[in-house]
């Protein structure tokens, strides 16, 4: 799926990480751990083409996506990538349904009708019947579940999740991890930046960003 080769990132003359090498395949869930400021989120952003690495390559289906132009980047994000952001990245003055319908309009391979896909996704995250509520009226945990439902509708090949349980109670955190795990077992590749031991324990491999290097803590693949 994704093969990272000798990736490096320098920010304000500081090397966040260098010579990063790892692979994540379909059906695998990987965790990136490390202290705040170590560059976990930046590494996710590079994988998602939100930032450019300072060096190295990211191979996807035979192409080095770090060399993509704007059109290819947009296509990659639309057709391949799903991102679970720390701040949810939802349209706050729109309803839950309207947020998910943005995804259905972009999906060319959506199974069934858009309305059915949205309803099924909301049911899966425990928000059935809440589609007409505005995002700004929801709690943080509920907003994270809407963002998760967006991934369920999108059905991406690659999911990048940045501290997806960081601000959640135990029940919401468990639901998020369960669904990410289900998505990986369904064939999606999942990479998670996390401090949560419960998340790490569910992953097939765990890598630590430590003193500018990537260290393998666990790999059961």
Residue ranges and their predicted role:
Residues 134-138, 142:
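Conserved ABC ATPase signature
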Residues 65-82, 185:
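ABC ATPase NBD coupling module
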Residues 159-162:
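Catalytic Walker B motif of ABC-type/P-loop ATPase nucleotide-binding domains
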Residues 48:
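Helix-to-loop junction immediately C-terminal to a conserved catalytic motif
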Residues 133, 153-154, 186:
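Conserved signature/switch motifs of ABC ATPase nucleotide-binding domains
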Residues 2, 17-19, 76:
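Conserved structural motif at the start of ABC-family nucleotide-binding domains
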Residues 56-64:
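Conserved ABC transporter NBD signature motif
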